[in-house]
Swiss-Prot record:
Keyword terms, alphabetized: Ribonucleoprotein, Ribosomal protein
Region (Disordered): 160-194
Gene Ontology molecular function: any one: structural constituent of ribosome
InterPro entries, per database record: Rbsml_eL15_core_dom_sf (IPR024794), Ribosomal_eL15 (IPR000439), Ribosomal_eL15_arc (IPR020926), Ribosomal_eL15_CS (IPR020925), Ribosomal_uL23/eL15/eS24_sf (IPR012678)
Family of this protein: Belongs to the eukaryotic ribosomal protein eL15 family.
Origin species: Methanococcus maripaludis (strain C6 / ATCC BAA-1332)
GO CC annotation, single: cytosolic large ribosomal subunit
Protein name, entry field: Large ribosomal subunit protein eL15
HAMAP family given in the database record: Ribosomal_eL15
Length: 194
């Protein structure tokens, strides 16, 4: 079994392997860091490489922390009946992973989101590592596995829901029975898909 398979097996159920102690010590530092921070190398090398990461110029890994649970809505200033306030029990139509990708893209506007993966969570927040690519870098333009990102059609792909997490949230991972209303888009079908 290769080294990557050992790492993959350990991360399948972190609570049953050495990953539990690693996460416990790492999260103490992560909580003190800003919500979006660039990291030198991926925490999960097996997952990162599986999603397209290579240790080369023009590719950056960023760790993003996002709150857990439902949407945190501000309380209306003017008085309302409690039943119509609309603060509690409101769930975002986007996944937390998708929010993490969008925040990373906003922090680094010259880079495009390639993919992302989960690295940890506690009671209050989740951490994701986002792989970003500089589409104007010469080493990316000359690499056949990345130069498709240099086309203008992929600009702002995280905010347009074109990443893997974005497509999953839009229901585009499914086809056939039960997926009749997800194409061409959720809004085109009057939001009947959600």
């Amino acid at each position: 079994m290769s080294m990557y398979n050992y790492v993959k097996e350990a991360w399948k159920v972190p609570a049953n392997s050495y990953v539990k102690e690693l996460q416990w010590s790492r999260m103490q530092d992560w909580r003190k860091e800003p919500s979006v921070i660039r990291v030198e190398r991926p925490t999960r090398i097996d997952r990162a490489r599986n999603l397209g990461y290579k240790a080369k110029q023009g590719i950056v890994v960023v760790r993003v922390s996002v709150r857990r649970g439902g949407l945190r809505k501000p309380r209306p200033k003017h008085s309302k009946k409690p039943s119509t306030l609309g603060i509690n029990k409101i769930t975002m139509a986007k996944s937390i992973q998708r929010i993490a990708e969008e925040r990373a893209a906003k922090k680094y506007p010259n880079l495009e989101v390639l993919n992302s993966y989960w690295v940890g969570q506690d009671g209050k927040q989740k951490w994701y590592e986002v792989i970003l690519v500089d589409s104007c870098h010469p080493s990316i333009k000359s690499d056949k596995s990345y130069n498709w990102l240099c086309k203008g059609t992929h600009k702002g792909r995280a905010t347009r829901g074109l990443t893997s997490a974005g497509k999953k949230g839009r229901g585009l991972m499914y086809k056939g029975k039960g997926a009749e209303k997800v194409r061409p888009s959720v809004r085109a079908n009057s939001k009947k898909a959600k």
